[in-house]
Amino acid sequence: MNAIEKPGLHIRSYLPHFDANCLLQHIVLSARKGVDLIHPELAQIIENGIRHYDRNRYCLLAWCIMPDHLHIYVVFLPTQLMGRNVLEWKSWITRTWQIVSGTKLLIFNPDYYDRYLRTLDQASKAIGYIEYNPVVAGYVVDPKDWRWSSAWHKARGWEAGNDWRPLFLPSGSR
């Protein structure tokens, strides 16, 4: 069993990762130099990839695709591990883009950043941080105007699942 298949603290390459069931995780994937993640076809592939297993393997709470990085805010369900899912996202997105574009371009840098959030207050702030990323960068005035984000989808009826709350909250605080 390798590091992406078991829970706990993993130190690979540059960044340590803490993977355990039912944690609120803010994950950032960075693009390789020269890759524009908001190219419309690529951004759609990315969005399809991260939304595909929503409410099956994880509860997707927020995301934002920026030109050179991708924010994903998620709670993995009890049988799922972050490392395995991140690897699958990156592999599927890259393979699909290579087929569509006819290139052998690698999309993401090898490692990723993750931070697990410990409180509902941190969770709320993380969603705001992720969805306001394009506003802070000067791309749009309102988060709901950034096409490649959960804020845009929320303005059009998408709702993050609440299935994660029983997994995260200690008994007695539900």
Question: PLM features: residue spans?
Answer:
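Short catalytic/metal-binding and nucleic-acid-binding patches
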Residues: 1-174
